[in-house]
Amino acid sequence: MAPPPAPLLAPRPGETRPGCRKPGTVSFADVAVYFSPEEWGCLRPAQRALYRDVMQETYGHLGALGFPGPKPALISWMEQESEAWSPAAQDPEKGERLGGARRGDVPNRKEEEPEEVPRAKGPRKAPVKESPEVLVERNPDPAISVAPARAQPPKNAAWDPTTGAQPPAPIPSMDAQAGQRRHVCTDCGRRFTYPSLLVSHRRMHSGERPFPCPECGMRFKRKFAVEAHQWIHRSCSGGRRGRRPGIRAVPRAPVRGDRDPPVLFRHYPDIFEECG
């Protein structure tokens, strides 16, 4: 049902034109909005509800300001036509959406999500790391296995002619190294591969000097030390190094093929005492 039409405002005494009244004499018909039956039919239910709320609010403001006047026919019609503002008169589009939600097309997420249990405040416990053995016991399925920490290459890895990749060299274990160094020093426990190295090492503990100099009789622990020591017994006029020892007379490194051994201070202490 369409709302009542706008009332015709009769001219009052002193007005030149209808509707042109003096300031301060405002009625509800001056500020209200009226629709024709054709215009009212084009409005949606939501727009009609908004129109009702605005008109009732405007009428309430005028009453609060103390403007006199009878109750407008539009407000009376809004109060009588309660069916036009019932929940059944809804927007068709909104009604379809709400109907779809009622049918279960769009589930409610709040209903599906479980409620969170409030956690007790306190220090968090650190996660306990379990060993692979415990994980294997909990998972008896043979398909679920724990991978080893380090992938080991196959023992008999052959050379691949297609890619040309060489098999990785095996890393000797501690047991293999201990098996190679079978000669152990009884004094310090150090191990050696060859017995000659063990014999030379034991002279450090015993203080034995089995290599004497044939010219002066000075004894040394190693044979190459005797050969280096014999340089000081050479004549000062014959040898290539038979000059006064100094910076230029002694090379920094021995030359390959040189018969003279490397010169060390511990091999010729007497020369520095005699000639400086």
From Swiss-Prot:
It comes from the Eukaryota. The keyword Secreted does not apply. InterPro entries: KRAB, KRAB_dom_sf, Krueppel_C2H2_ZnF, Znf_C2H2_sf, Znf_C2H2_type. Gene3D superfamilies: 6.10.140.140, Classic Zinc Finger. One of its GO terms (molecular function) is DNA binding. Residues 1-10 have a biased composition (Pro residues). Belongs to the krueppel C2H2-type zinc-finger protein family. This is Zinc finger protein 688. It comes from Homo sapiens (Human).
